[in-house]
């Protein structure tokens, strides 16, 4: 049986596919801190690095598919875009290519520049994804907070022999740094929105505040 779509139905169908792709790949990227791979050497760190590379590749493919399905072919150029490109250009111009001290970080920085424009594209295509990405980011903070509390009370193993509190990271430094980044987002969401997001923001903020002391 052949299924035929009207013009409006086809447009909605393609829009749903674009939104689904952006949601899945964006959630994968935001969940990077939770990833680890014990099969790799130093899997806590390298697992996150490889996952980030995979998520970036999938987001790039998703952008191509989104454009092919009829998405906008361009995004408005803004001042932050120019400042970011200027900073990237200065970094490349001043990088010592003969010594080449940090090739991995240079690649990572280039991926962050690409990520900026990929997010700009997806959020222009589907502005509703802002709320979804906020929810996923706060959810990762909540998971990290619960993970840390389990480690403090002996219900989960720490990833470092000298520290009891590491979350999904190797030591408490990046763990607390990540919670410090997510906490203001949770507080802003709790104060800015109402109903579901309001209460979820307070739950995440409360859980994060309990852990570091």
Where in this protein do the model-derived segments appear?
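Membrane-interface segments at transmembrane-helix junctions in multi-pass inner-membrane proteins
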Residues: 156-189
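Membrane-interface interhelical loops and short amphipathic "cap" helices
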Residues: 38-44, 95-100, 150-168
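Hydrophobic alpha-helical transmembrane segments
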Residues: 88-95, 129-158, 174, 209-213
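Generic hydrophobic alpha-helical membrane-span motif
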Residues: 100, 108, 150, 177-179
């Amino acid at each position: 049986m052949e299924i035929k779509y009207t013009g409006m139905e086809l447009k909605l169908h393609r829009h749903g596919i674009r939104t689904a792709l952006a949601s899945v790949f964006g959630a994968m990227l935001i969940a990077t801190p939770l990833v680890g791979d014990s099969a790799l050497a130093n899997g806590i760190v390298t697992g996150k690095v490889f996952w980030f590379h995979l998520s970036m590749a999938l987001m790039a493919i998703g952008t191509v598919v989104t454009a092919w399905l009829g998405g906008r072919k361009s995004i408005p150029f803004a001042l932050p875009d120019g400042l970011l490109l200027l900073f990237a250009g200065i970094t490349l111009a001043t990088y010592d290519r003969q010594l080449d001290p940090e090739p991995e970080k240079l690649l990572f920085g280039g991926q962050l520049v690409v990520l900026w424009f990929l997010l700009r594209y997806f959020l222009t295509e589907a502005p509703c994804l802002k709320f979804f990405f906020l929810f996923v980011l706060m959810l990762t903070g909540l998971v990290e907070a619960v993970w840390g509390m389990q480690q403090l009370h002996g219900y989960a193993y720490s990833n470092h022999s000298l520290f009891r509190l590491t979350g999904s990271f190797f030591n408490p430094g990046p763990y607390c740094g990540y919670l410090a980044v997510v906490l203001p987002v949770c507080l802003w969401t709790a104060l800015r929105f109402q109903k579901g997001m309001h209460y979820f923001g307070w739950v995440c903020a409360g859980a994060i505040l309990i852990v570091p002391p």
